[in-house]
Amino acid sequence: MTYLFMILAFVTGLFVQYLIIVSIVLIHELGHFLMARLLGWRIEKLMLWFFGGVMVTDEHLSRPIYEEFLVVIAGPLQHVFIHIGLFYFGDLLLGEQLLTEAYQYNIWILLFNLIPIWPLDGGKCVQLGLTSLFPFKTAYQAMLIVSLCFIIGILIVGSLYMILTMSGIVLGIFLLQENIVEWKRRHYIFMRFLLNRSQSKQKSKKQIVEVEPSTSLYHVFTLFKRSSHYQLKIRQWDEAVIEENEALAFFFKGHTAQPTIRDMIYFKEMN
């Protein structure tokens, strides 16, 4: 998509405007990158789009929520510094018309990135908020539903009232495709969330969940929130208590196809 907009910029004689937009997007992404590096994250690469970018890292879901929030918010924060830079130095670098356009691009890119659409910063903030309050699996799916509703709503309203440009429609379709792919990947994301928990040494507040022996481990895991560590209190079994790390380890070792709490207890007693 970046190459498409570059070609269009050449053809329409708007290459300087294109460079201004790319510069704003690059500074925005550098905000994410520098904050992530400051927090010691491993970063694979940065990918730029026309109205934003993606910092590819495997640290998501394995870091505390507050760290992810700092990394997310560091991008939009750069637009404040860009505005200050344009105010003090814009006259030296740009003419009056281009300076006005630079202000507008900076504001529009900021507002666009704050829309609650995945994988924009607004969507990521919604995801972090929901996953801090509700079980991860439920929250992640809810975030994607909200995101899809916003995209479809904007495309429908924008098309009916003819307020979307061709580039806006292309961008909307691109984001729609990204969200559909993410929806199809939601089970994989949940499994990655569980795997990270099984390896995590972070200290979280403890919560006790009462479960029946016949309850599947997978169902129990769907109750897990990111910000809590769980102990499973088993009804009708001398009130036995199992730590979540034990349950996750048993689940990932694949002793049975659909392990239950009872399966795990029998296995522990036999060993």
Language model segments and positions:
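Topogenic membrane-insertion module of multi-pass membrane proteins
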Residues: 1-16, 73-79
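Small-residue-rich helix-interface/hinge motifs
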Residues: 11-68, 101-105, 109, 118-120
